[in-house]
Amino acid sequence: MIKRDSVYEQWQSAAQSGELDYHVFRKEQPDEQLEKLNRALFEGFGFSQKDLVGKTVVDIGAGSHLRTRFFQGAKIVAVEPLAEEYLDKITWCELNAADVVYPLTGEERINDLDGTADLVVCINVLDHTYNPAAIVENVEKYLREDGQFLLSVDLHGETLDGMHPVELTDTSLADMLIEQGFTIDQGYRYLSHRRSYGHGDALTFIAHKRRPGE
């Protein structure tokens, strides 16, 4: 008997096709107003545009709108499973602005990224995945010893709409970070300019790799 992971099947059959449909047919091209909101988002997290000049930012689940372009002068590495489809079907796709693009899921380990990232960003992504713990485990490997992890995601308890295969809570996310070797520096609900990315409540953690003695 073949036993399949129902969460993975939902992600593969519904979530990814839904994401592709949204980005190709319904997502508006980024404009000045969206870039203003994106700046407000990162500044609300405590970052400025020049913080990572000459450093490496890894964007997990980057989508078609490359939020991490916010970091001027940084090397941007995008990890996006639908990258090839976005680049082929969306004329304005901002993945073209990334220095490197891996058309892979966040769950897949990319050995070339081990120990390279000064900052890993994962925004409005984890609730759309099939194995969040594997992603967090990979992020811990990708970070330099003094690197940071910015994780921000909507909590909404919705797993039956096809687009959100996993249910996340503030407790489960905090436990996941701690179990995968992180120390949490900041954690809070809501965003600086709105309650969530889409629905529910946004939860954000900023963390670093656990150091000896922590």
Residue spans of the language-model regions?
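Core SAM-dependent methyltransferase catalytic element
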Residues: Q180-F182, Q186-E214
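A short glycine-rich, Lys/Arg-flanked "PGG" loop and its adjoining helix->strand segment in the class I
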Residues: A133-Q148
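Short catalytic micro-motifs in class I SAM-dependent methyltransferases
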Residues: N124-V125
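Class I SAM-dependent methyltransferase Rossmann-like catalytic core
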Residues: M1-D51
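Conserved class I S-adenosyl-L-methionine
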Residues: L150-A174
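Class I SAM-dependent methyltransferase SAM/SAH-binding core
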Residues: V58-R109
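A conserved beta-strand element that flanks and buttresses the S-adenosyl-L-methionine
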Residues: V121
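Short amphipathic alpha-helix with an adjacent loop that forms part of the alpha/beta core around
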Residues: S48, E108-G115
